[in-house]
Every structure is written in structure tokens, then in C-alpha cells.
């Protein structure tokens, strides 16, 4: 699989207070394509960020029900991947920011 396909697989990193705390344990969270499997997520992270992945956990996140101006709707369903890296590897999302 070429590297541009991997960029379609990984939607975006999840940067919240909770994911910042687990990043100290070498775990990082990403929203991924809803058809993504553990093995393809592992290959994509290794190819894009040039790191060694130890383990991948996948979660299906059901969309919440929201009401806006009296109209009830639902947010989209998403798939989340928690990626554990080997000890000597890490990902720096804010590398070029000064």
C-alpha cells in the first residue's frame, strides 16, 4: 500500500487533556477510517511517523444525539485507535511550532 493511502486511513490525532496524559505512557489516539483494521492502522502509523508500534486498540464511538433549534439529530459514528509505541519511540505533534 502506498503512503498516500495511509494518509487517507488516519483522519486526525485526538489532542485532549486525557490523551495528553496517556501520551506519557507512550500511547497516542487517532480518529481513523471506519473500515480500518488494527494491522492497517499499525502499518500506517509506522509509515507516516517512522516509529515502531507495539500495540493498537480500536474503539467504535457511537455518535451522540444533539438538539439544535428544536431539531434532534445525531453526530456521526467514529472509530478511534489508541496506539502504543515501543519505549524509545515517540510522536511530536507540535514539532515545528515555536
UniProtKB/Swiss-Prot annotation:
<dbReference type="GO" id="GO:0005840">
    <property type="term" value="C:ribosome"/>
</dbReference>
<dbReference type="InterPro" id="IPR013025">
    <property type="entry name" value="Ribosomal_uL23-like"/>
</dbReference>
<keyword id="KW-0687">Ribonucleoprotein</keyword>
<comment type="function">
    <text>One of the early assembly proteins it binds 23S rRNA. One of the proteins that surrounds the polypeptide exit tunnel on the outside of the ribosome. Forms the main docking site for trigger factor binding to the ribosome.</text>
</comment>
<dbReference type="InterPro" id="IPR012677">
    <property type="entry name" value="Nucleotide-bd_a/b_plait_sf"/>
</dbReference>
<protein>
    <recommendedName>
        <fullName>Large ribosomal subunit protein uL23</fullName>
    </recommendedName>
</protein>
<dbReference type="GO" id="GO:0003735">
    <property type="term" value="F:structural constituent of ribosome"/>
</dbReference>
<dbReference type="GO" id="GO:0019843">
    <property type="term" value="F:rRNA binding"/>
</dbReference>
<comment type="similarity">
    <text>Belongs to the universal ribosomal protein uL23 family.</text>
</comment>
<keyword id="KW-0694">RNA-binding</keyword>
<keyword id="KW-0689">Ribosomal protein</keyword>
<dbReference type="GO" id="GO:1990904">
    <property type="term" value="C:ribonucleoprotein complex"/>
</dbReference>
<dbReference type="GO" id="GO:0006412">
    <property type="term" value="P:translation"/>
</dbReference>
<keyword id="KW-0699">rRNA-binding</keyword>
<dbReference type="InterPro" id="IPR012678">
    <property type="entry name" value="Ribosomal_uL23/eL15/eS24_sf"/>
</dbReference>
<dbReference type="Pfam" id="PF00276">
    <property type="entry name" value="Ribosomal_L23"/>
</dbReference>
<comment type="subunit">
    <text>Part of the 50S ribosomal subunit. Contacts protein L29, and trigger factor when it is bound to the ribosome.</text>
</comment>
